[in-house]
């Protein structure tokens, strides 16, 4: 009788246990994106009509880069680029060269170059903080185009494996 109780208890234990499948919803998960990559975090932002949404541009698991050109396409009918500021990835003994160009047509170019004594950076970090303001309700997409580039210290291209996308929703 006692062994039957153990079998029943063990049976309930196995039946009641649920094996959970992992959810990879973090943009910076390596299982979610192949490095080296340029990505946005958060991938989805919600704000009010006329409100602002901040998005960070990240370099994921890059090796020996000296510069970045990020070309971001956004829905100019629904979004305005309010501000763009340098991230901390290229910070060092000298401030990075950081330039951006946005004429309101839906293309934002960000250029950032490392000026530290070792001339290259490796790892994961934030390149820029971009604040968008909404003009119309609904979803507006943002995406890094294949014209984006990672450069080594000799100006040679480093292939990018993953390009980030995002959505900004105005309610």
Labelled PLM ranges:
Residues 1-16:
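Sec-dependent bacterial lipoprotein signal peptides
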Residues 17-171:
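Acidic, low-complexity intrinsically disordered segments
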């Amino acid at each position: 009788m006692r062994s039957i109780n153990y079998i029943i208890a063990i049976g309930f234990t196995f039946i009641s246990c649920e094996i959970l499948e992992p959810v990879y919803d973090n943009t910076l998960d390596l299982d979610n994106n192949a490095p080296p990559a340029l990505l946005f975090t958060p991938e989805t932002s919600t704000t009010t009509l006329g409100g602002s949404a901040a998005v960070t541009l990240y370099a994921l698991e890059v090796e020996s880069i000296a510069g970045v050109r990020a070309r971001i396409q956004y829905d100019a009918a629904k979004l305005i680029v309010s501000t763009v500021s340098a991230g901390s990835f290229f910070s060092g003994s000298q401030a990075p060269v950081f330039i951006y160009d946005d004429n309101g047509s839906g293309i934002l170019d960000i250029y950032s170059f490392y000026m530290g004594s070792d001339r290259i950076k490796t790892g994961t970090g934030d390149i820029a903080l971009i604040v968008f303001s909404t003009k119309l309700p609904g979803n507006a997409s943002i995406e890094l185009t294949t014209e984006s580039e990672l450069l080594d210290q000799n100006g040679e291209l480093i292939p990018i494996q993953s390009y980030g996308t995002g959505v900004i929703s105005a309610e």
